[in-house]
Structures are given as structure tokens and as C-alpha cells.
Amino acid sequence: MLQNPQLHYLDNAATTIVAPEVADVIDKAMREHWANPSSLYGPGACSEEALNAARAAVARTLGCKSRELYFTSCGSESNNLALLGAVRTRTFGKGIVVSGFEHPSVQRPLERLAKQGYDVTVVAPRADGTLDIAAMLERVDKNTILVACMMVNNEIGTRNDVEHLAAEVKRRNSRTIVHVDAVQAWMRVPIKLDNIDTLSVSGHKIHAPKGIGALYLSDRLVQAFQPPYLGGEQERQMRPGTENLPYAMGLAAAATRLAKTMKSRDTAMRALNRQLREGLKAFPEVVINSPENAVPEVLNFSEMCIKSETMLAFLAEEQIYVSSASACGRGQPSHTLAAMGRDPLAIDTAIRVSFCADNTPEDVDAFLNRFEDGMKHLQKIRK
């Protein structure tokens, strides 16, 4: 999708480029479905029909009912909506259990809830960056109203067995709500909603535009759910404000497109990941932070020599675009690596490379070549 062959975009965990066919759907929707879906006249009814079709398409990719799928502006909003709304459905306790490497859009709402009197327990991940499921389950008791975790870590790509966690949580306390942040998992790994009550996804991670996301809200919670927003009746009173129909249609187009290619994309991503891992073996200083069983789209490593920001600036001059941590934590050290117990040098020199189906072996070669140049040049300057 990039027109410049000299540019190598390898930061797809931060955002993806909008697919041309998705952009076409959005452009057409803006011209043809301009009416408010809530309007009672003909064009409004057409917009409502298109909105319902988009909702059904996204719901199919998640395996949920259309009525359980709510459009939002992004994954972060979905997390906030789920967490702040779900806890109000439970009055039997104040306990909340969360993993120690969650996205800020999960961390911050729970910090607010802690100030409001909720008992929030943060469980550190295992040394390999995966959920410590046993430790999380130990904290679940009769007073636990919520357990929150991410399915795929946004910084190192670890894949967590949230299905097992959810099942065990429900076995210990059937009334405990399980929320899953699936922003980095959607269209990368299969999602099973059994025992999961709320789940968030985002458009701009799957080649849809920024500004659109979705929340799965189980029928089990709907009646008691108390959304934090007030206003109109849109999204069945869960999220007021006129729906962004063109972007909802774009999200549906992007999800439908990728759902057809999950297996082939996984094979291609694994090949790129192996190529990068093999190439990094030429640098004895490098320590790989992403375990072998992480999703192949993400590879995080520490080069243990040059600060990330310095290396990233050098690579950017060469039109190689990668990152050091979550884009939502700009300028901040990786809290994921810190939670894993990595030392300060490993954290300060961490680099995240993340792929999409548009990347090629040539992108990996370009990165490795420029990275080698950067190591030589920047070490020479440092001396």
C-alpha cells in the first residue's frame, strides 16, 4: 500500500495503513449514506440498514450476536466503557484483579476505581511476559467483581490463554465479570467468547481508519449495565452520539477482508518473524524479549548498547519506522518490560518491530542492514 519503495513501515502494532478497498467503502458511504441512522425518513432508514449490516459483519468475526456489538471510537474507549460500566452491575463486592502489563486504557480506569474504594489487585506477569494465571486465580474470591486482562500484549506480542483464565474465574465465582482487551489479538488469533463478558477491539490495528472501534457486551450484562456516558439513545443507549456510519462500514469491510486470510497471513508473518530472529543473531549484544510462542506479528528485543530513542531516530532518517514501546505511552519506558523484571538497560534499549501482511522479506533485510549501520555508527560516536 506504500507508494515509496524506500520506505519500510514496521510499526503495525501502533497503527496500520488503511487498506485501499476499505477507504473506497468509506468514501462511498460518505457520499451515499449521508443521512442520520436515527432519522425516520427514507435516507435515514437506508443509513440504519447499512449500520445494522456493518454491525452484523463485525459481530460475525467475533462470533457474537449483532445486538451484543456496540460501535465506539477506538479500543481505548471500549476498555473505558466496559470497565466503568461493568463494575456498576455488581454490588456484592469491591474486588478487582488485573494483570500488571495492561494498556493504559485499562490501567487508568482501574486506578480511578481504586480511588473510589474498589480493591484493585495488580498481578505481575511471569518472566516470559505471559499472564500468571495461577496467581490471578488465587486472588479471585466471593468478593471479586471483575477480572481484566489482555489477550495479546501490545509491546512484546505474548499470547495469553484468556479462555482458560475466564473459565476458571467463572468456576470460582460465576458472578465475576471477565473483561478482555483484544485490540492486538483481533484478526491475529482466534477469539472464543465463552465465559468472556466484555471484549474490546479497534479499527486502526486492522487497516481500518483511526476513530472507530467496537465493544462486545454479553447479553448477560446488558440489563444491569450502566454506561458512564449520558445523552442520546444511540447504540441502544450504551454510547450516546450519532454513529460514525462510514467508519463503521469501513471497520466491517476491514474485518471481513482479514477474516478470510488469517491462516495464510499467519504463515507469512511467521516467516518474517523467523527471518528477523535469525538476522538478529548476528548481533551478540541483542536480547530477544518476545518469547518464541508470541504472535509472529510482534518482535521486541533490546540491543543493550544504544538508547532506543537514539536508534529510532537513526533508523527514521533511513526511512525505517519501528518503535520502542506502546505508542500510547510515548516518551515513557516500557511498563511491560518493567513488569517482567527486565533491567533498566534492557528497557532503555528496547525496540519493537511489528509486521502486517503488506510487509515483505525486503523490509526485514532493509531493517537489519540499517540496524547494523546504526549500531556501528552510534557506538563509534558514543566512544
Where do the language-model regions lie?
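Pyridoxal 5′-phosphate
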Residues: 1-383
